[in-house]
């Protein structure tokens, strides 16, 4: 039992966090600077191809859609939360992605994104099929 507690403490100290139940994650409203539509511009090392596009849609209430497209669209809903004072997107797949502001861009899962007026047509179609629980920006 003592070894298990020590192992758990080491994981927390190492920055490895895990979400056991998505439904238990406390949603945090988005700061004004984050609510809206974000998209990669140009090639990104974190994406599978130079032609791939990464998008993040964030509502004021803190609901999110992580949308990545290349030969197909992968759209995963989630919600913002604070983990150790860091703004983090937790997806329904229980993946954790820290969101950091850098001037007029954000850093998200190894990608640099800039604000755009609307999502791509493919991400908008994904939203039509599975709308977020709160109104879009």
UniProtKB/Swiss-Prot annotation:
Membrane topology: Lipid-anchor
Compartments where found: Cell membrane
GO cellular component labels: plasma membrane
Coiled-coil portions: none
Alphabetized UniProt keyword annotations: Cell membrane, Lipoprotein, Membrane, Palmitate, Signal
Pfam families in the cross-refs: YedD (PF13987)
Lipidation (N-palmitoyl cysteine): 16
Signal peptide: 1-15
InterPro entries: YedD, YedD-like_sf
PROSITE patterns: PROKAR_LIPOPROTEIN (PS51257)
Highest taxon in the source lineage: Bacteria
Membrane among keywords: yes
Lipidation residue positions, type S-diacylglycerol cysteine: 16
NCBIfam families cross-referenced by the UniProt entry: PRK10397.1 (NF007705)
The protein's name in its UniProt record: Uncharacterized lipoprotein YedD
Source organism (scientific name): Escherichia coli (strain K12)
């Amino acid at each position: 039992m003592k070894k298990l507690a020590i192992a758990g403490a080491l994981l927390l100290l190492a920055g490895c966090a895990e979400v056991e139940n998505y439904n238990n994650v406390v949603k945090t409203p988005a700061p004004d600077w984050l609510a809206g539509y974000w998209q990669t511009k140009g090639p990104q090392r974190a994406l599978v191809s130079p032609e791939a596009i990464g998008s993040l849609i964030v509502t004021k209430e803190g609901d999110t859609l992580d949308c990545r497209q290349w030969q197909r669209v992968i759209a995963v809903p989630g919600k913002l939360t604070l983990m150790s004072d860091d703004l983090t997107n937790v997806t329904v797949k229980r993946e954790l992605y820290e969101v950091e502001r850098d001037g007029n861009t954000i850093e998200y899962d190894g990608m640099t994104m800039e604000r755009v007026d609307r999502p791509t047509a493919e991400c908008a179609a994904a939203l039509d099929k599975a709308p977020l629980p709160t109104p879009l920006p």
